[in-house]
A protein has these predicted regions:
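Short S/T/G/P-rich N-terminal loop/turn motif that feeds into the first structured element of a domain
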Residues: 17-69, 74-86, 91, 98-192
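Sec-dependent N-terminal signal peptides
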Residues: 4-14
């Protein structure tokens, strides 16, 4: 299943260590509350800039379904993630957004591949995100990881800022690929 996404806000440049904590959330806003959810998300992200260990937070909405939002978070480690969860600004976001969400799904991820070039807040202002969810055949994840790493490493350039591959921690055969492009035209040029 493909979801074409655009960037709402970005936090900071980051590097991924072995202990990095990555989370993905799917948030479905109730009717007429998309703007409020965007505002709450932006406030939470901007308030998170000064948190040590918070590396990046991407807040995106689906082009095909504007009330569907994704939050992709990168933390130095589990301790940094827990510190973010206990912050006043996150508690405010969680409390206020709970009243306007039709659903919320948390997906715990394991990093499999991460390649980036020119991934800075300035470059990401008009960036285009593409998320792909895959279900692999049983016991094929190691082979797929090798293939996807080679492909992603070659794909990162001036038009493709980043390529990430994750597997779900509770279902290793379910993968999430996140691609960040300069703009939608760059994404379309890579598809052909």
């Amino acid at each position: 299943m493909f979801k074409k996404l655009f960037l709402l806000a970005v936090l900071a440049a980051f590097a991924f260590g072995a202990e990095a904590k990555v989370s993905l959330y799917e948030l479905l806003s109730t009717p007429n509350n998309k703007s409020l959810l965007k505002r709450l998300g932006r406030e939470n992200i901007l308030s998170s800039k000064s948190e040590p260990g918070t590396q990046a937070i991407f807040f995106m909405s689906a082009k095909s379904k504007p009330e569907l939002f994704y939050v992709l978070e990168f933390y130095k480690d589990e301790a940094a993630y827990k510190k973010h969860l206990s912050s006043a600004h996150f508690k405010k976001f969680a409390s206020a957004s709970a009243e306007i969400l039709a659903s919320k799904k948390a997906i715990s991820l394991k990093k499999r591949a991460a390649f980036s070039k020119n991934l800075t807040p300035e470059h990401l202002k008009d960036a285009y995100f593409h998320i792909t969810n895959l279900s692999l055949l049983a016991k094929s994840d190691a082979k797929f990881e090798k293939i996807i790493k080679k492909y992603m490493q070659k794909s990162v350039d001036e038009g493709a800022y980043a390529q990430f591959a994750f597997s779900q921690k509770d279902a290793p055969n379910k993968w999430v690929l996140v691609e960040i492009y300069k703009d939608e035209a760059s994404f379309e040029s890579y598809r052909h």
